[in-house]
């Protein structure tokens, strides 16, 4: 009898720990919650304030699971603004100063992949001047910095996974029909 009680206790404790951790990671919220927490909604995803501490907000990313219900995917430990976001069906990009951070969004937290592109390195000092938008798996931006001691602007095309960068010869090569903040619901 003691063995049965011990086994049942171990199983219950294991279920309690695994159940609690899964519930907190996959928290579901309604669209009202997103809006009440200064959220941004996209076609398939949303971002809302997750926590407010010491006058600093942290955000969570949610996947739409029904027309007005979202499932929490992961937490962003940084403060963001709407104009720093670029979203596509598969990526969410946060663009700040000289850095682009992309999150490849899939259905679960285990599948979220973070990618990053830094323009301000020890060798090159560039900042992102303008984000033109997204088209056919490429992000188009302009970067400003010094080259040979002179102020310079370059027009750059990045693959959606930020793995490759092409410097364009001129702004005229940036497509005019780019979509900025694609799928942003207003």
Segments predicted by a language model, with ranges:
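Positively charged n-region of N-terminal signal peptides that target proteins for export
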Residues: 1-4
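C-terminal motif of bacterial Sec signal peptides marking the signal peptidase cleavage site
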Residues: 16-19
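Short beta-strand elements that form the blades of beta-propeller/WD-repeat-like
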Residues: 37-54, 84-101, 132-145, 180-186
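Structural motif
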Residues: 53-62, 97-104, 147-158
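Short loop/turn segments that connect beta-strands within beta-propeller blades
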Residues: 65-68, 105-108, 159-163
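Beta-propeller fold detector
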Residues: 71-78, 110-123, 165-174
């Amino acid at each position: 009898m003691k063995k049965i009680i011990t086994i049942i206790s171990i199983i219950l404790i294991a279920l309690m720990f695994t159940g609690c951790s899964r519930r907190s990671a996959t928290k579901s919220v309604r669209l009202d919650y997103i809006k009440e927490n200064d959220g941004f909604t996209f076609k398939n995803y949303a971002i809302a304030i997750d926590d407010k501490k010491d006058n600093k907000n942290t955000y969570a990313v949610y996947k739409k699971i029904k027309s007005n219900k979202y499932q929490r995917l992961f937490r962003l430990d940084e403060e963001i603004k709407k104009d720093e976001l670029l979203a596509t069906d598969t990526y969410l990009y946060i663009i700040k100063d000289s850095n682009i951070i992309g999150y490849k969004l899939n259905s679960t937290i285990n599948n979220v992949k973070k990618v990053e592109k830094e323009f301000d390195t020890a060798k090159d000092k560039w900042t992102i001047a303008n984000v033109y938008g997204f088209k056919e798996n490429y992000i188009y931006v302009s970067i400003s910095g010094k080259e040979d001691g002179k102020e310079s602007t370059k027009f750059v095309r990045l693959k959606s996974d930020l793995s490759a960068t092409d410097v364009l010869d001129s702004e005229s090569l940036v497509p005019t029909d780019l979509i900025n903040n694609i799928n942003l619901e207003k």
